[in-house]
């Protein structure tokens, strides 16, 4: 994993670079602005990247590796097709920025004059968001064994909120990145019957069920308010940050539920993950809600290199589209979101032609898009279950929906903004697809 992630953040535009590439760029004048503005968020102590790029002494040994990564566009991690959609968190480098880094590396990676350096970037220690107003941490460390399959662990943490809270920045952070595959932090509102047997602070594993028991449980859960996804942690996933006037709602008396996916790596470890959030300074005009178009009714045949799965969801009232995030596992190949409007027109919102499980990103629209009432979001994904997929755990197996990485998922997450007093449960109608070919 380190080989894929060591250059996380060599990305985006450098402020103040000259229109023409200087014949001998220097670190302080030409390269540091790129690292500082986009890269040091992760390339600093305690963050995702395994080495910091805060100083010349730290970055200089990696000059040739940085050059190779940006020339081949392996870095920055931005797999979206540039022909569809504009995104405010676009990490891709311009041609000029690439040429500047190449010229710097090829001319000996010169240090230059420290007086040319911009002021040091300011970060909140331990967070990718502003200083949190509230932090919720697992009450106890979870012991991850050195080997074996680890069931998803659900940990309920009461919010203690006595009044509704509006949240406009939020981040889930693993305590031990070596063993945490992903975190999903849910808000469980008062009256919810989801995971009703879980005790606060105690890791809970849902009981295995047959079809009838699962059907009855879901019917029971549907009689109460559903949980809402707040934020997740996964490789490459940035913290959640919303624009002014928009926020997510955490109702008074809610619980937070951490869904923890641990992966054994040959060495036993301990984890104590946490959730941080920044409260909106005033009630927002719009509530942001995470929805999804998913399909769990598929069977990917052994050896199939291009198996197609579709999902759809229709939006009943006008909303604003905030962001998109496709999710698959190791056999995921490509993913496309298309909006079908009630006028009969359609538009590709996002195309990820080379999906990479190691880089799961939210794509925040540069200009949030109006979705008229009756808009259908249609997702199409392809999976490569052939021996030619180097990430494939086993090309001889038929693959179905499942939590573990060697199983598969097909989920098109997206956030929408609506009037803050609207009930999001009234907004969506999801089409149920059968197996491909049905």
Residue ranges and their predicted role:
Residues 1, 16-22, 430-438:
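Basic/polar N-terminal segments that are highly enriched at the extreme N-terminus
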Residues 4-16:
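Bacterial N-terminal signal peptides
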Residues 16-161, 169, 253-259, 264-266:
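Aromatic- and Gly/Pro-enriched helix-to-coil junctions and flexible linker segments
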Residues 30, 323-324:
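Short, hydrophobic/aromatic alpha-helical segments in well-folded domains
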Residues 82-87, 117-166, 171-320, 326-438:
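Beta-strand-centric surfaces of beta-sandwich/beta-rich domains
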């Amino acid at each position: 994993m380190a080989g894929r992630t060591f250059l996380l953040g060599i990305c985006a535009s450098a402020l103040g670079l000259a229109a023409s590439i200087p014949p001998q760029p220097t670190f302080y004048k030409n390269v540091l602005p790129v690292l500082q503005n986009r890269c040091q968020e992760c390339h600093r102590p305690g963050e995702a990247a395994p080495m910091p790029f805060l100083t010349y002494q730290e970055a200089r040994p990696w000059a040739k590796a940085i050059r190779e990564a940006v020339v081949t566009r392996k870095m920055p991690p931005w797999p979206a097709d540039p022909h569809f959609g504009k995104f405010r968190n676009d990490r891709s480098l311009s041609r000029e920025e690439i040429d500047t880094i190449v010229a710097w590396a090829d001319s000996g990676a010169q240090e230059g004059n420290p007086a040319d350096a911009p002021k040091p970037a300011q970060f909140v220690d331990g967070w990718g968001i502003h200083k949190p107003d509230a932090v919720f941490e697992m009450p106890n460390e979870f012991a991850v064994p050195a080997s074996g399959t680890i069931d998803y662990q659900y940990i309920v943490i009461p919010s203690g909120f006595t009044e509704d809270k509006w949240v406009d920045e939020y981040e889930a952070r693993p305590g031990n990145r070596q063993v945490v595959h992903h975190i999903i932090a849910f808000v469980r509102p008062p009256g919810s019957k989801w995971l009703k047997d879980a005790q606060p602070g105690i890791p809970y594993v849902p009981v295995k069920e047959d079809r009838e028991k699962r059907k009855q449980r879901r019917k029971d859960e549907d009689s109460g308010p559903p949980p809402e996804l707040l934020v997740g942690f996964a490789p490459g996933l940035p913290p959640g940050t919303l624009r002014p006037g928009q926020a997510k709602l955490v109702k008074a008396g809610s619980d937070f539920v951490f869904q923890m996916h641990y992966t054994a790596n040959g060495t036993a470890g301990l984890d104590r993950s946490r959730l941080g959030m920044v409260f909106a300074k005033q009630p927002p005009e719009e509530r942001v809600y995470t929805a999804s178009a998913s399909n769990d009714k598929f069977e990917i045949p052994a050896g199939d290199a291009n198996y197609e799965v579709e999902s759809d969801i229709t939006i009943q009232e006008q909303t604003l589209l905030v962001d998109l995030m496709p999710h698959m596992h190791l056999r995921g190949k490509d993913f496309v979101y298309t909006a079908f409007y009630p006028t009969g027109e359609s538009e590709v919102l996002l195309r990820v032609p080379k999906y990479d499980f190691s880089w799961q990103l939210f794509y925040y629209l540069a200009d949030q898009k109006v979705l008229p009432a009756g808009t259908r979001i249609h997702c199409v994904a392809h999976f490569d279950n052939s021996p030619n997929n180097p990430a494939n755990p086993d090309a001889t197996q038929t693959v179905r929906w499942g939590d573990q990485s060697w199983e598969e998922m097909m989920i098109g997450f997206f956030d929408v903004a609506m009037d803050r007093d609207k009930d999001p449960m009234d907004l969506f109608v999801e089409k149920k697809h059968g197996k491909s070919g049905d």
